[in-house]
């Protein structure tokens, strides 16, 4: 190999090219209607049903990506991927709400998330042809970089007006017990999800409609029509399967390598 060429860099470029190719392939398949059947996620079925009921009752559905932040420093929960998953779910739910005429109430605990929500939900209403129904006041910033203050603000929203349901996906920890228990006592159906090992047990205690771990990253594709979201989900599944196969293959190779006199794997 020529001097100055990094094997790791070449490998990463190949992975990126493969990922782009898979997204393009799956997007083309989705546009042709060739979508792989998805396993059911009851929590998202409950959210879909709540959006339909809210159009009839006139009660709002609360949407939230939590109090996760982007580019968090030490001492602040860094859950950028969870935040993005929550933002995408909120936008897809808002798009469905715009088509159904469902009132929504959106809250966040980070300035960046708040701006992203306002822009994304405005765009969702515009694409649904209901731009006149978008109300900026329905997208609220409750706090900034303070998880406990944020869930306290959500409980205030719960007590201020009747809600048809509340969907909260993002970075939640022990503070979720405050809002989860309050919602359960008020009889508000809650659809929740996180990857946090401290937040998940509390979610399972307060609501059966819980997305566990990586299920939150698939939520957008379950609510979105066929297209880019489906392509991203299928690509993630393929890459995840490939990583698992490589890990198992590497483990087996490392076990048999000393006995068969095979060359060691690079970097080991």
Positions of the model-derived regions?
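Long, charge-dense
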Residues: 96-98, 102-151
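C-terminal functional extensions of proteins
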Residues: 198-200, 204-268
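Membrane-proximal low-complexity regions enriched in glycine and acidic/polar residues
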Residues: 128-186
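Membrane-interface segments at loop-to-transmembrane junctions
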Residues: 38-47, 231-236
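Hydrophobic alpha-helical transmembrane segments of small proteolipidic membrane proteins, enriched
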Residues: 2-42, 256-257
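Extracytoplasmic/lumenal ectodomains and periplasmic regions of secretory and membrane proteins
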Residues: 165-214
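Acidic, Ser/Thr-rich low-complexity segments on the non-lumenal side of membrane proteins
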Residues: 47-93
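Gly/Ser/Thr-rich loops at beta-strand to alpha-helix junctions
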Residues: 66-72, 83-84, 110-114, 169-176
